[in-house]
């Protein structure tokens, strides 16, 4: 069973979507049979497309393209009368018999081979087709390979063993394969965008390695304490395995929470990624314990690689020290102020964030034919060519007065600010619905284009009162504006839901009011800094070439929502793994400072390793040619760095030192009604200890 991914990002029932459906219904005869591709030509220097020789070359190429049985029709530039003012640029339109997703690679290769004729003749020839892509936008597996290699190095240095480093990679790949297979099969039944596969691969690989890391780390601790292999496997699965299940559930909840936005493609992304995370969790708690039982003492802490031992200095006198934790604890106020101030400064660009959707002009490299076609069309017709608007004018009657009113409305629309050109009103078969095409002066992401769409919709109020004619706007630019608006409206609701859920969840886990509050505020700090950094590099264009972005452009409209859903789960994971140990020590000793010191020493190293592994996987995806995947990879890399290293490893211990015993305050009445949640399975340890104590007493 093959895959059937969709690349269209759309939201049903937006104003632009409704207008588009009216056009489809009323102007059926004008609708293309299938996908359309523009073949853009630029004449050689000192020549025009009107030259007989140039026209002959173009005609030959178009005839060759027509030979493809999948092609329905081909319209030449002269036929469409679309030459630029200087007659040097024009485009042909190739219409296929099938929709974009059904256009085969063979058909794409056919058209790519055909245009080599005009290219060889010195006529620049480029292709652009909306949902029909000709340049390779896949990650080709290289991004995953880079991430896995870096993760392997981090694991090898963490555990001082190549064998131990390989186990999390192995189980993560198994989980990833299961998740990917499930998503690919799912595309045959529901609409799933191809970017969902990349997002799921990112998360599935990262959490798969991290979750295995936590369980293996606990297994080795038990072996070091003298437990047998079966006991160590059981305890590691019961304790760290329980924490992994909790961690996985928080990530899954965050991803499934994307469905509250009621945006279909976001829901599909969330469900796809959640399925892969679920596969990673199941492999970690089912398959990994079996593998640990097989390798047994071969991965015990004493079995260290000599080469890595020399490089890391493992086993030397400072091996058990925690210099960073000690530094933070000695200067908590200064560290807190500096860390919060740093994140606040990095967050500043967030306040001028401009959301948009991908276009060939902002997401494609100049090495791609789509981007070169985009630039040629811009050169010929201006930025507004890519932001064409279709206005639907609806009347209740089909009379001569209606037609006159429509013509008047078309002229009035032409007088609106930033309008480059307007076509006459074209009547539909019913005589009640007219279509008016508007070309703005500005591009699809320009605020002036957004203002123009708003002005047309505002004018509808006037025409309804005066002529009983409703105006509706559609077109790619209008669709994008509506999608961005819908996402912007969903963002605060989704953020409030996630933050509220995180607070309640952590109150249950830590039985404290202030620690969850600190965790949530830390999450908001890291989120703000992440979006600030992404705006600085992607939207403002600073050093964008270093990161491989072809041009500065708006932030992907759905990136903030996705980032909140994913970062919520990861942030809560780090908080739980770090603070759970602190709570355990505080419960036994009542000493808040000792709890923080021991928590940082015991859990800090694993949290750092987990953060580095996450970052290595996400950095790998920043190497992807597709700027959508690249921007998601960048955002998640910054998000993990800020949250794991600045918030959890710096601000959390510093603030907890300042709070002292009050950090663990919980009203007695609330303590009585809250259920006890044993995230790390410590009750298992207590039962084992009690059992061993009884055996010891019996043998005395």
At which residue positions do the language-model features occur?
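Structured non-transmembrane domains adjacent to transmembrane bundles in polytopic membrane proteins
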Residues: 12-35, 43-129, 352-544, 554, ...
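Membrane-embedded transmembrane helical bundles of large multi-pass transporters/channels
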Residues: 1-3, 71, 87, 97-355, ...
